[in-house]
Amino acid sequence: MPIKPLIILPDPILREVSKPVEHVDSTIQKLADDMLETMYDAQGVGLAAIQIGIPLRMLVIDVSRNETQKNPLVIINPEILWLSDERNICKEGCLSIPEYYTEIERPKRLCVRYQDREGKQTEIEADHLLATCLQHEIDHLNGRLFIDHISKIKRDMVIRKFKKRAKEKNAQEAIL
């Protein structure tokens, strides 16, 4: 299972809306395995397929924080059924926006209908960290980033920083 390269801001692919997975088959299951390996390697708790350049409505999450007892979720074609009125503030980061963390307010609980790794339709009710991760990763599938939940001034600052970083990286690669 190969580790996939992560797409990093300001790459415009992160703003694409992902398309539904039509059939869960061995190709999709292999992609799920690759995504999990990539997420674990990057020490993340969630990863959307678009973050490795694949615009499919698919994500993986593992909030267990336990090296020995992993509890991965493979979520295909998620649909949010409801969000609670009660809110929660959680410090978020993103594998596609490395080394940037900020507090984001989101609904504390939600219910999501999705297909699992075998293609079986199921539902999950989640709260706290899992609810935050689900909302964060589903945002990715809709072309949204967690920085879209902060003020425009802060968001523009973050985008400028990552554009500058990408420009410097490209200039350095051109020299080599």
UniProtKB/Swiss-Prot annotation:
MF terms (GO), sorted A to Z: metal ion binding; peptide deformylase activity
InterPro entries listed in its UniProt record: Peptide_deformylase (IPR023635), Peptide_deformylase_sf (IPR036821)
Reaction(s) catalysed (UniProt annotation): N-terminal N-formyl-L-methionyl-[peptide] + H2O = N-terminal L-methionyl-[peptide] + formate
PANTHER family assigned to the protein according to its UniProt record, in alphabetical order: PEPTIDE DEFORMYLASE
Keywords: Hydrolase, Iron, Metal-binding, Protein biosynthesis
EC number(s) reported in the record: 3.5.1.88
UniProt cross-references to Gene3D superfamilies, sorted A to Z: Peptide deformylase
Organism: Bartonella quintana (strain Toulouse) (Rochalimaea quintana)
Name of the protein: Peptide deformylase
Function according to Swiss-Prot or TrEMBL: Removes the formyl group from the N-terminal Met of newly synthesized proteins. Requires at least a dipeptide for an efficient rate of reaction. N-terminal L-methionine is a prerequisite for activity but the enzyme has broad specificity at other positions.
The protein's required cofactors: Fe(2+)
Taxon lineage: Bacteria, Pseudomonadati, Pseudomonadota, Alphaproteobacteria, Hyphomicrobiales
Cofactor note: Binds 1 Fe(2+) ion.
Annotated binding of Fe cation, by residue: C94, H136, H140
